[in-house]
């Protein structure tokens, strides 16, 4: 029995990987979906297949991971702006699934604000998020290099 070296492969002049039977063949730009072989995967045009190469093909798989956060608790660091009083403890932890209104409520309680007093909160000293924004989403998008969500607060409007 003669053995061929493992690095030479088949005797064809240009070895190229053969397409897998499990991976769908993208459609050409002028082809219509559903006109070819029946495949359980969604057919894509050639231009779309390049863009969507790394995205999940099944929407349910994407939706399963969409609502989850990497950490259960988010570290929020409060920074006073202008004449706002300093907090004795400027760091707190809040559940990632809570809404930003909980952060506002916590800060108002710590500052001992009256019902009529205004408090303005800004993420990264840049924008005021909506009260129904999820804290975990803000953390994923705007955390600092220490993994903290920095919230600046003021008793008068600032940054805008």
Curated annotation (Swiss-Prot):
GO terms for cellular component: Atg12-Atg5-Atg16 complex; autophagosome membrane; phagophore assembly site membrane. CDD domains: Ubl_ATG12. The keyword Protein transport applies. InterPro entries: Atg12 (IPR007242), Ubiquitin-like_domsf (IPR029071). The keyword Membrane applies. Transmembrane segments: none annotated. SUPFAM superfamilies: Ubiquitin-like (SSF54236). There is a cross-link at residue 160 (Glycyl lysine isopeptide (Gly-Lys) (interchain with K-102 in ATG5)). Ubiquitin-like protein involved in cytoplasm to vacuole transport (Cvt), autophagy vesicles formation, mitophagy, and nucleophagy. Conjugation with ATG5 through a ubiquitin-like conjugating system involving also ATG7 as an E1-like activating enzyme and ATG10 as an E2-like conjugating enzyme, is essential for its function. The ATG12-ATG5 conjugate acts as an E3-like enzyme which is required for lipidation of ATG8 and ATG8 association to the vesicle membranes. ATG12-ATG5 rearranges the ATG3 catalytic center and enhances its E2 activity. Forms a conjugate with ATG5. Forms a thioester bond with the 'Cys-196' of ATG10. Interacts with the ATG7 C-terminal 40 amino acids domain. The ATG12-ATG5 conjugate forms a complex with several units of ATG16. The ATG12-ATG5 conjugate also associates with ATG3. Belongs to the ATG12 family. This is Ubiquitin-like protein ATG12. The gene is ATG12.
């Amino acid at each position: 029995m003669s053995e061929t070296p493992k690095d030479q492969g088949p005797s064809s002049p240009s070895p190229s990987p053969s397409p897998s039977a499990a991976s769908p063949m993208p459609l050409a730009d002028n082809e219509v979906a559903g006109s070819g072989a029946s495949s359980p995967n969604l057919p894509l045009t050639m231009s779309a297949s390049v863009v969507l190469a790394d995205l999940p093909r099944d929407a349910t798989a994407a939706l399963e991971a969409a609502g989850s956060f990497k950490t259960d608790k988010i570290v929020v660091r409060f920074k006073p702006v202008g004449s706002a009083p300093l907090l004795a403890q400027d760091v707190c932890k809040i559940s990632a699934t809570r809404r930003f209104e909980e952060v506002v409520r916590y800060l108002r309680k710590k500052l001992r604000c009256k019902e009529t007093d205004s408090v303005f909160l800004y993420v990264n000293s840049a924008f005021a998020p909506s009260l129904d924004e999820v804290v975990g989403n803000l953390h994923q998008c705007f955390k600092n290099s220490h993994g903290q969500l920095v919230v600046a607060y003021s008793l008068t409007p600032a940054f805008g």
